[in-house]
Amino acid sequence: MAWKRGCRSSLLVPTLVLGLMVSVTEAGQSAAAGGDITFTRDIAPILQRSCQKCHRPDGVAPMSLITYEEVRPWARAIKTRTSMGPRAGVMPPWYIEKTIGIQHFKNDPSLSDDETAKIARWADSGTPRGDLAHLPPARTWDDSSKWAIGTPDLIVKTPQVVMKAVAPDWWGEIESVATGVTEDRYVTAVEVKEVNDLPARSGAGTVGGRYVFHHLVWNTRVPDDNASIDPAAPGEGTTTWPVHEVGREADFFDLDSARLLKANTHIVPDSAHLHANGRETKAHLLIAFKFAPKGFVPKYKRSPVQLGTTELDIRAMEANQQAHAYAVLPEHTKILSFEPHLHAPGMRMCMEAIWGAQIQTLNCAGYDHSWVRGYNYDDDHAPLLPKGTIIHIIGYMDNSPTNKNVPDPRNWQGSGNRSVANMLLDLGNKVSLTEEQFQEEMAKRRERLKLTRNTFTVGCPLCTVSAASATRKTQQQQQQP
């Protein structure tokens, strides 16, 4: 999960700072030309929904965008960053391409074309304030907003680390810590936050200036009979969890695919990457869990499918390269999320499903290693794929001087965990379904979405046929050589 290098300049937050600020003039109080777009009626609601989660006092972003006075100086920068399209640097950071594949996701903060156009017109027409009576009530940011998962049922603190002000990047293991859980519990959400001793708002322009953890790969497991844990040897009660990395938000698991936190487990941080930020910094992570009700057992089991490859051959001084990885689904599968993971040359990833003669592009997304995103599908649009489907991911790479993320495009690049190496992975969540569960899921979807034989639906090749026909087609496909 490493980056190209660990220095502060390589860890830029996708900020709105472009060096351009609209001048503050009385023209801002006038009516907007060509449509009367105003801050109070048109712009404030957009910012509240899609921006203020980060752009607020004590938020991760470098400036607050709550009031008119805070927003107006950044109007032209906001216009530029919201109109970039699904690629690195766009605001809000959401890179799903809207012209292809599934378009129904949970917690989607992206802007519509109409909203992007409104922002542009507002910035170009003098940034009028508008009637204060049109201003929506301000969002409240109380203690509960500190955790996207709501009030956690369990918070575990990792051991403290100390990073010198100027030092090389550090990779290694951090001491494990007991969770204190005395009974098996299923987890429906997990969220990780870094806590450090940096002064508030210091280093706001860069991730490196605000944090020392670039990422942490971790799992939970039960100690062996000698009360010891070998990080290299997963044992009883081992559960893997989403990697904590720069920009990652909370992870929510479908209730029927909740993850098990065994009694007496420890958190095992088996691969951490720390970087210096210009100040000696003491830091630790808080790992928060949200539990399912006691006694709950999830309906589905996690899929064993891993989608990625280590066979990467990224040529020097060349843009528009592709890398591919395939996996065959051993069971009927529901894909809950799509999470591209590349490294510095990575620009974009697509995922497609191959079922017989059908090839469907499920999604394409731009990629920004400064702000890694996962995309959780809405329940009624998560891909439902029959056993034997081939999942194919395509990574689009740029190892040329035009890609400023690459430290030296004259070098050939291969696969690996460290900064100078690369990855091609989909880290999205999947669950396996029995034949009965598969048919049940498709039946519910047919009913809720009013699907017919003439309906085209992406990600569910058998949703528009009868249950008997779906079973027959699955059997026929599996019998083919």
PLM regions with names:
Residues 1-7:
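N-terminal secretory signal peptides that target proteins for export/translocation
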Residues 10, 54, 367, 463-466:
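General secretory precursor processing signal
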Residues 10-23:
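Bacterial N-terminal signal peptides
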Residues 26-185, 189-193, 264-270:
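Aromatic- and Gly/Pro-enriched helix-to-coil junctions and flexible linker segments
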Residues 45-48, 216, 454-457:
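Processing junctions and N-termini across compartments
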Residues 120-146, 158, 162, 434-475, ...:
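Activation corresponds to long, low-complexity, non-globular regions
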Residues 142-431, 445, 449, 457-462:
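His-enriched metal-coordination microenvironments in redox/metal-binding proteins
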